[in-house]
Every structure is written in structure tokens, then in C-alpha cells.
């Protein structure tokens, strides 16, 4: 299997760091999974942007009379959850769609369920936890209306992330179960080491692409090789 240069994240040249991952939906992900994989990537981006907006909301919270703890925690959540969510749940589902790996599907279900729980907690907004959720935002209207309005923006975004995360988890789980996936298959991959064998992964990727192409071919209309012009035998 040829080594491809890492291209993600696309860092500016002045940063003395190199990309850590290779990511290309068009070449790695079969057509039947590409849309879902991209939507999960967009969900990760939305979650990261929401954490950034939450930092601004906590700054407004601080300016309006709130404590500095929330702002500090919001900054911590931004620099911690953005890379961790990419590594812990997006990369597993990316590799699962790429190689049809039950082990990576299970890793995604485990970590993404945790992501869903965290998103719900963030949307609720317990004061002192560094998130502008519903409780924190609504309760701050009595202190500073302007700051509370700003805090509502990340609150709505956290709610959207939680809802979209639930929908995504349900959709991927339905697909996985419908395709015959199970915990026993994931355990078998773990026992045999197939989940980290590059040759096995390449074979699985080729099989996934072949299955996708076969499904597309079956959906195409069939035409006869011999033209039929419909001439009548009667003169």
C-alpha cells in the first residue's frame, strides 16, 4: 500500500508543525458512504466552531459580571475537545467507512456516545462548567441582558450539535446493524489484529469499493447490445 503524505490539518507554512493525518473523501471513502462521512466531518467542524463561539459567550459572561472560571474552562474545552473529538470519534468512523472495519465502528459508537452526552450537558449549561447553556444564559438575564443575549448564541449552537449528534449516531447505527455488523465481528478483528493490518485494510477497502460499484451498476438501466429499430415485416 503506497504511503500518502499527510494533509490534515492544513496548517499555514509559518507554523513549524506538519499535518498529522491523510484525509481525502474522494479516494478513501466509497460512494455509498461518502455523503455520510462528509456530514460527520461537517458536524465535527460545527462542534469546533461552537466551542469557539462559546469562548466568546463566556467572555461576555465575564464582562457582564460573571466569574473568570467559566472563561478559563471555555478556553480549555476549546483547545482540548477540538483535536480530541477529531481523533477519538471522527477518525474511527472515517476508517470504518474506508475499510468496513467493525472494530472502528465500535470505537466510533463508544466515543461518539460520550460526545453526545457532553453535547447535552453543554446545551443544559450548568453554571461554573465553562459553557453557555440554557440554565446559565437564562439565569443571567437578571444580571446583564446584553451578555445573556450573547450567551444565547452558543447555547443554541450547543443544542443544534446535540440534536444533530443524536441523528448521526442513530443513522450510523442503523446502517451498521443493517449491514450485518455486530460486537462479535469487532472482537474478532481485535483478536486477529485485522483492524491494524494495512494489507487487510487495503483488501477490505478494495472490497468496499467493489461492492459500491456493483450496487451502482445494478441500479443502471440495462440496454441490449443488438439495436432494435422496430421495422415491420409487412410492406
From Swiss-Prot:
Q: How does it sit in the membrane?
A: Multi-pass membrane protein
Extracellular compartment spans = 61-67, 126-148
Primary location: membrane
Taxonomy, top ranks, is:
Eukaryota, Metazoa, Chordata, Craniata, Vertebrata
Q: Which residues lie on this side of the membrane: Cytoplasmic?
A: 1-39, 89-102, 170-235
What does it do? Required for the calcium-dependent exocytosis of signal sequence-containing cytokines. Probably acts in cooperation with the SNARE machinery.
- Name its species: Xenopus laevis
Under what name is this protein listed? Secretory carrier-associated membrane protein 5B
List, alphabetically, the GO terms of the cellular component aspect. Answer: Golgi membrane; plasma membrane; recycling endosome membrane; synaptic vesicle membrane; trans-Golgi network membrane
Record family assignment: Belongs to the SCAMP family. SCAMP5 subfamily.
Signal peptide region: none
Amino acid at each position: 500500500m503506497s504511503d500518502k503524505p499527510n494533509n490534515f490539518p492544513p496548517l499555514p507554512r509559518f507554523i513549524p508543525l506538519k499535518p498529522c493525518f491523510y484525509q481525502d473523501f474522494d479516494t478513501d471513502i466509497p460512494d455509498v458512504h461518502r455523503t455520510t462521512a462528509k456530514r460527520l466531518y461537517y458536524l465535527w467542524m460545527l462542534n469546533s466552531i461552537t466551542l469557539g463561539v462559546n469562548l466568546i459567550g463566556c467572555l461576555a459572561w465575564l464582562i457582564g459580571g460573571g466569574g473568570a472560571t467559566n472563561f478559563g474552562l471555555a478556553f480549555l474545552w476549546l483547545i482540548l475537545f477540538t483535536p480530541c473529538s477529531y481523533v477519538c470519534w471522527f477518525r474511527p468512523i472515517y476508517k470504518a467507512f474506508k475499510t468496513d472495519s467493525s472494530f472502528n465502528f465500535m470505537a466510533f459508537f463508544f466515543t461518539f456516545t460520550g460526545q453526545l452526552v457532553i453535547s447535552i450537558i453543554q446545551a443544559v449549561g450548568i453554571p461554573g462548567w465553562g459553557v453557555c447553556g440554557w440554565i446559565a444564559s437564562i439565569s443571567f438575564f437578571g444580571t446583564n441582558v446584553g451578555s445573556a443575549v450573547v450567551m444565547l448564541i452558543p447555547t443554541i449552537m450547543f443544542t443544534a450539535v446535540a440534536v444533530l449528534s443524536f441523528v448521526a449516531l442513530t443513522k450510523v447505527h442503523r446502517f451498521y446493524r443493517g449491514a450485518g455488523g455486530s460486537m462479535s465481528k469487532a472482537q474478532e478483528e481485535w483478536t486477529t489484529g485485522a483492524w491494524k493490518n494495512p494489507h487487510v485494510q487495503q483488501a477490505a477497502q478494495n472490497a468496499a469499493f467493489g461492492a459500491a460499484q456493483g450496487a451502482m451498476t445494478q441500479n443502471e438501466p440495462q440496454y441490449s447490445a443488438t439495436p432494435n429499430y422496430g421495422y415491420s415485416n409487412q410492406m
